Amino acid sequence: MAEPLLELDHVTAGYHGQAVLRDISLAIAEGSVVTIIGPNGHGKSTLLRTISGLVQPMSGEVRFDGQSLRGRKVHEIVALGVVHIPQGDLIFPDMTVRDNLLMGAYLPDAHAEADTRIVEIFSLLPKLEERQNQIARTLSGGERRMLGIGRGLMTGGQILLVDEPSLGLAPIVIDQIYAVITRLRDEGRTILLVEENVSRVSEIAESIHLLDNGSFVWQGPPEELQLHQEILETYLGG
């Protein structure tokens, strides 16, 4: 069996000595889409932050492509191929759309391929091409979310860590965002997706992991989760 692209081995992590994640183990194969669901404030974003180096594990190991990430700086983890697209609209508001995208190509390898990558991103996100000379703060909420995704893609990367891409967006915009994620999946991208919109992730994920109070309490394929209405009602309010 091939080694997983990303592996968390009994990871405990948190802030100021207080554990938020407890004994988390997870293996993600290359080219797969895995989703983390669960109540707010129970560790989903912390899990992504631990993988990307923003939070260091208290114990356990995070490995990417066979290499330990322990002690590595964030930019070193990005250079290995881990792209973290955080929750919300973290953009440079007074820069143009194009310049925001170019900020994602700050690593030497990405910078050398910036012109090629920006063409690819405009193909994936044509609205950004239309808005490329527009100041970012004038974009709609959905366009800002797409800009954040596009900037993350500018780094290249083998795996995308995407944190609640549908948060606070209108249904029609969520459709657009998930069309992009679906296309990335179809292109063979490896994606770890944090989301509360169970119906949407059930359409694209190969496996779903339910995180509650810092631990996985259920995991399996989406079609199996739909058979356990009591789980959805208990942890996600239905």
Identify the meaning behind each predicted range:
Residues 52:
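Helix-to-loop junction immediately C-terminal to a conserved catalytic motif
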Residues 60-68, 80, 113-118:
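Conserved ABC transporter NBD signature motif
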